[in-house]
UniProtKB/Swiss-Prot annotation:
Keywords carried by this UniProt record: Cell adhesion, Cell junction, Cell membrane, Disulfide bond, Glycoprotein, Immunoglobulin domain, Membrane, Phosphoprotein, Repeat, Signal, Transmembrane, Transmembrane helix
Protein name per UniProt: Platelet endothelial cell adhesion molecule
Family matches, as Pfam families: Ig_2, Ig_3, Ig_C17orf99
Molecular function terms, GO-annotated: transmembrane signaling receptor activity
Native source species: Sus scrofa (Pig)
Motif interval(s): ITIM motif 1: 690-695
GO biological process: cell surface receptor signaling pathway; cell-cell adhesion via plasma-membrane adhesion molecules; immune response
Region Disordered: start-end pairs: 697-740
Amino acid sequence: MRLRWTQGGNMWLGVLLTLQLCSSLEGQENSFTINSIHMEMLPGQEVHNGENLTLQCIVDVSTTSSVKPQHQVLFYKDDVLFHNVSSTKNTESYFISEARVYNSGRYKCTVILNNKEKTTAEYKVVVEGVSNPRVTLDKKEVIEGGVVKVTCSVPEEKPPVHFIIEKFELNVRDVKQRREKTANNQNSVTLEFTVEEQDRVILFSCQANVIFGTRVEISDSVRSDLVTVRESFSNPKFHISPKGVIIEGDQLLIKCTIQVTHQAQSFPEIIIQKDKEIVAHSRNGSEAVYSVMATVEHNSNYTCKVEASRISKVSSIMVNITELFSRPKLKSSATRLDQGESLRLWCSIPGAPPEANFTIQKGGMMMLQDQNLTKVASERDSGTYTCVAGIGKVVKRSNEVQIAVCEMLSKPSIFHDSGSEVIKGQTIEVSCQSINGTSPISYQLLKGSDLLASQNVSSNEPAVFKDNPTKDVEYQCIADNCHSHAGMPSKVLRVKVIAPVEEVKLSILLSEEVESGQAIVLQCSVKEGSGPITYKFYKEKENKPFHQVTLNDTQAIWHKPKASKDQEGQYYCLASNRATPSKNFLQSNILAVRVYLAPWKKGLIAVVVIAVIIAVLLLGARFYFLKKSKAKQMPVEMCRPAAPLLNSNNEKTLSDPNTEANRHYGYNEDVGNHAMKPLNENKEPLTLDVEYTEVEVTSPEPHRGLGTKGTETVYSEIRKADPDLVENRYSRTEGSLDGT
């Protein structure tokens, strides 16, 4: 019975409200109170599935009225209202017929009287167990490989329900198949079960698990009706021919047969397997046949499988073949031989009958129809050898023997990819190669006496090694292969390594300050470099070297025996060798050289300079006084010839060039120098007044005492110019040589 409002619930609610209104009007005159309220479950709070359950709500009400008041009773399950009633009775009941799991829950009831309300505590009700499920089948007879649909349901319960369906063989307790499924929206499931080839009479069981909140109630397991299974084809059977002992060489016949019922829609596939190998099969009949000449290789377990869609039936048999003769054995004197050694092979059968035929083969090709083979080995004899022995139709192949004939290596050649010279640090490839000889070939490269690297080559191609030599080095390689001879050494490869020029430096051997006349020695050196090295010496601001030399040395010297001021300046040098890139000379530092004079030379030069200065001064002074003297005499001679002043020896008396008697204020040396110039030298017209002044000069005689005096009269010409012009005068002076 569903716990919810009926469709007439609204009507009942109206009636209850009306009754409550009336009660309230009456209550204005009477007093009411709810003393207590509680619930009772009959037969109890725990009931079994399918039992009836009664819910009672018991109310104790007190009133001043002589008539019992009408009150409202409401029933709740898990806080959801499912039933209400108006009553004047103290007890109201709600009946549940055949309680199920979903009726489990927490119940309570509420009483409403006028505006007063009281609710009971919650009462937990548990319905234990699940009603038994129902199992139905879509058929009770089925053919092998068919499908049976099984439906399991619990109509009385509400979902979700978890169903477990199991398949059993009749009278067998073990479960053949088990399947589970949960129905979330219904209380039944339908599952399909395939009928297998071993099934004869089968049945199914069903169990329902009802999930309610956190609780799960499990039903009893209910079995279905029996299902009869019919065969679509029989189990396969083997037929072996010949019967009894089968000897190698006999024709072996293996046949697998089945019987197909009329209910089968088509023939199944029949497969014969030797171990896992399929040797015969058939799809259009009731048998499959495998026929072959018997050998011991056919000793095996044979399986016959019959398969049709979902059905597979299997049968097995062991077939034994008696050996006619043993497998031949091939042996050799050695498996690795040097070229030219003797190769011997022999084939044998333990207890072989005389009629056995032998053939020795190499790589599947016949070499000799005999039991033994002897020959001188060559490299082309390398390969895989077998022996074939036959008696009648039975042919057997021996084990394989791998023969390797090794040709001796030729002397290996050694070479590298660069020229005769290698620049330091450059990677070179050194190759070793033996033209003749059996591969694989093992090469070892020696650098000096040390092993540099090893390499295995699977052909006669050269082995290539890489190295970065930093100095002159010798390489040698050793080649070896399978031959018993020791490793074959090559000739020695000598590689000359050229070190590029590094760190060019220019220095002076004595001092950067050189005394004039002493030697200058410049040294251009390199830290490292292979000769010959070209050195070029430069003076700064000069495009061409003043000295160039090529040496097999890491230094070069330029020597100047006697230095002069011309050698003073800044110097640098360039150096290069064959390892230097084209036009890429390395430049040194710049060196400043100063040339100074020797002290004695400085003194000599000073003396010479002083002497020259003195000489120049003397010459200048003499020239000056001579010029001055001429300037004094020249105007007098132009006026009249003056009588020479004679001393006591009748010699002319000359004025002392150092005297200052004739130099007086107004004297113009230029006038004296130019006294010979004509008057019309000046282009402008001049008005001149000429006066003559008598000058008496007294000069002492150099060879007489100061008391002796001489007098000379000199006439000077005085020209007067216009006032605008400069006035030149020649004053008349009288004096004596003694200055008085």
